[in-house]
Amino acid sequence: MGLKRRIKKYDVEIRSILDINSTFGGYLKMFRKNDGHLQNNLFNSLNGMDPRLAHKLQKSWAARFYEHVFCEIDESLFIPLYSSDNGRPNFPVNIFIGLELIKHLKEYTDEALLDEYAFNYQISFALGLRTLGERYFATRTLYEFRSRLYNYSLQHPDTADLMFAQFEKLTDHFIKVAGLSTSEGRMDSTQIMSNIKLGGRLSLAYDVLACGVKALPEILLNDSLKIFLKADYKTQFLYQLKATDIFSRIQSVINHCVELLRLVEGQPELKDNPAIQIVDRFLKEQATFIEEQNQWIAKGNREISSNALQSAHDGDATYRKKGGKHHVGYALNLLETCADENPVQIVTHFEIASNTTSDIEMLNGSLPKAEELGVKDLFTDGGYYSPKIVEEAEAHGIKMHYTDMTGRKTSSNKLPYSSFTIQDKEKFVLCPAKQAPLRTNFNEKNGILSAHFKLEICNECPQKETCRVKFQKNDTVLYVSQKALDTEEIRMKITNKEERRECTSKRAAIEGTNSALKRAHSAGKLKVRGIVKCGLVIGAKIIAHNFRQLARFFNGEIREKAIKKLSTFNQGIPVSTC
């Protein structure tokens, strides 16, 4: 390359950096976008490969990943992670993000991932590298990138989940490439666990105290606290006692926690230590201060909130009993496409929250995004039902469909409210026997409708035993809320065999998606702690899952229902030619 061409090339690179810098208000001077992979070098490993092997490589997952993931990664999202000071240009962000996605796609450990990056040409090809080993980075560089990503998300909890933003951009691309319809969606939640060990209340108490003790300089500790530094003391403390002594042992830990917190009084640098803050939180959640005794007394087991601390190492994890099983960790809520004509289905939205968050709360938070995606019909189970959420969904242009309902079912030996003629759900017009009420009323404040009927007529009515009216001294009366009318309306739709069959069929496969995330991508038990890290990892795992679905599309593994649907309209089956 001549001198003039080299100068021109460097001038273009510098202008590219300056353009990005000006776009972000001079926020970064040394961020460099990695687009060199778009121009192939004349001499590279691919050019020296046997044509048959090169053709096979072009048809492999690596080529799909490069085209539909790596080339679609928006590096500009990650500009705020880098300092504006002059310094060495960043290692390519799209390579780091690509590596994270491949890690969860292939279920690699970090050690295996780095080896594959160094010596596996498919991995290099997927990351836009055409010569094996052409880009080296120290292991520490990858860990520092993860640390920046985590800390930035921690400091901007409401606006800065960069992995989620990347998920949204890639999802939009996947939908466009596969020609997916998003008009129908299904939703389900599942329980996931962070990298913590399940233990009883006493084990938790010991771990909290031991972490707090280790966080203090040994010179501050007295003999009663120093013993918790011994490696073999935990076994003696937890297991060498009778069942009847457990509560007194918990009280002993409570007393030690009080003692430890007194040692750090007046020392802000120690009080601000996360381990000490965990001790303070544990004390307030697990004990009550009795002023008369001037002492912290351990609470009974039933007095402990489900939002209380569950692990000394993960302050965000919560407890929930669901489906007869005990869960510690988080809830993951998924929204997935489910239109019959779609060749494959992908996850279009997700949310991770404390597992004490109800399905209704998560659905309510997802409605704006569902509307943005163009969802018109949403299929869920009964855990997502409430009259208010149905109204809220309708306000977003979404019709709810339920496979079942939670709560108490109406008595089967009583006439349904729908057998009464009710005008606008505010006024009783006729009873099932076609009798008009003496008077009817609607209370707008509480949404209760009432109607009074003639006692003589009701006494002679053949439907007396199954009617919902209550007999009084001078008349009969019926009270019903608008919520009850709405609920009954939904229940009647569910009991319609055809509608229920369709709804169940539409929703059922999302259970398989949950299973795939847990089995194929190890989402059931994550290797990180804290809701922020769990959210970043879950985002990478769901992108990996969606890419698997996209790969199925390109391989012609089309859903049977989609084949029938496309055949009906004579559209054929979409098969990629690239």
Predicted features and spans:
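Anion-binding and metal-coordination hotspots
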Residues: 109-112, 131, 135, 143-578
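Basic, short loop/linker segments at the boundary and entry of helix-turn-helix/winged-helix-like folds
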Residues: 59-98
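Short, solvent-exposed segments of well-ordered alpha helices
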Residues: 86-90, 104, 321, 534
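Charged, often Cys/His-bearing segments associated with DNA-binding zinc-finger transcription factors
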Residues: 2-69, 464-467, 471-488, 492, ...
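Short amphipathic helix-turn modules centered on a small-residue break
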Residues: 77-83, 125-132
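DNA-recognition alpha helix
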Residues: 113-126
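Alpha-helical support elements that line or immediately flank enzyme active sites
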Residues: 95-107
